[in-house]
Regions:
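Soluble sensory domains of the PAS superfamily and closely related sensory modules
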Residues: 95-107, 197-214
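Amphipathic coiled-coil signal-relay and dimerization helices
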Residues: 70-82, 180-186, 223-225
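Extracytoplasmic
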Residues: 119-148, 159, 166-169, 215-231, ...
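Solvent-exposed, extracytoplasmic
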Residues: 50-58, 83, 147-190
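Cytoplasm-proximal transmembrane signaling helix
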Residues: 233-273
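Short loop/turn segments at beta-alpha junctions that line or gate ligand-sensing/allosteric surfaces
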Residues: 90, 110-121, 187, 192-193, ...
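Extracytoplasmic/periplasmic ligand-binding sensor regions of membrane-associated signaling proteins
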Residues: 58-63, 73-152
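Juxtamembrane extracytoplasmic/periplasmic/luminal helical "stalk" adjacent to the first N-terminal
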Residues: 1-42
Length: 273
């Protein structure tokens, strides 16, 4: 029970940290939309839009990779930081764009992916989590729908998860979305290579916060925590070996105490006699 309680505390703290991180990203998206996009004409006041996006980026650049505005046809209208767009990326086929257009009332968060929209001249590849939403763009006397993209640096989430995956006892924590797509997993490389599997779809859909399961004949206890707004799940996997090993340690400790008591009794009896 101590193992479960300790892991529950770790999960609660981590859920709070991830939620705070995502709230900050939503606030960036809200500020970009309500304070910049809705206050300026996308064509006549493009400089003001760039300035507003730049201020937001500079204030949050430790956690951001880019902020971009696209029209409904996928054409880039504005972006920060100012870098070259890669040659004709068809954003209309990308998941973050389609999600925003399909469900227009929410901000959507993608699973991690390599950003392939902009070229900053370093020839580096950046892993990001994209948040996207439909926005209303003002163009003179007309309005049109577009998509606001905020790319978060994936390393922020990755560092949070790495900090709690240090026990070395066989247990681990992973993060998935509401459909079971993995966002972070300490064994991701083995899963990608087909050497490991994970029951993330079950964890994502489970209504129970803690349950037992068998995965490839391995008995495990699974604990699930929900990340507000996103539908993400933080999952703790505890192999039953850690519970049996704990019991074995307790038994060894009790036997050691009994042995010491027996030795003390023998010693006392000899002293008396």
């Amino acid at each position: 029970q101590n193992i479960v309680d300790n892991n529950r505390k770790i999960m609660d703290q981590t859920v709070d940290s991830i939620e705070n991180y995502l709230v900050n990203m939503r606030q960036v998206s809200d500020a970009a939309y309500y304070d910049v996009i809705k206050e300026n004409d996308i064509r006549e006041q493009n400089d003001s839009i760039h300035k507003g996006l730049n201020l937001l980026y500079e204030a949050n650049k430790e956690n951001l990779r880019s902020i971009a505005i696209y029209n409904g046809y996928g054409s880039l209208m504005a972006a920060e930081p100012v870098v070259a767009q890669k040659e004709e990326p068809d954003v209309t086929r990308q998941g973050w764009f389609m999600q925003a257009k399909t469900r227009m009332e929410n901000i959507h968060f993608s699973t991690p992916h390599v950003q392939n929209l902009f070229d900053d001249g370093t020839c580096r590849y950046y892993w990001v989590i994209s948040s996207s939403r439909v926005v209303e763009l003002t163009n003179g006397t007309d309005t049109q729908l577009g998509v606001l993209l905020v790319d978060m640096d994936y390393s922020g989430i990755s560092r949070m998860m790495e900090r709690i995956n240090t026990s070395g006892k066989g247990q681990y924590f992973y993060l998935c979305d509401g459909e079971g797509n993995i966002i972070y997993h300490p064994h991701q490389a083995r899963i990608d290579n087909g050497m490991d599997t994970e029951s993330s779809v079950k964890a994502a859909s489970s209504k129970e916060k803690i349950y037992d399961e068998y995965l490839e004949k391995n008995h495990r206890k699974v604990m699930v925590g929900a990340i507000s707004y996103t539908g993400w799940r933080l999952v703790c996997v505890m192999p039953y070996e850690i519970f049996t090993n704990k019991m074995a340690d307790v038994k060894q400790f009790v036997l050691l105490i009994l042995l010491l008591m027996a030795m003390m009794l023998v010693f006392v009896n000899r002293m008396i006699s």
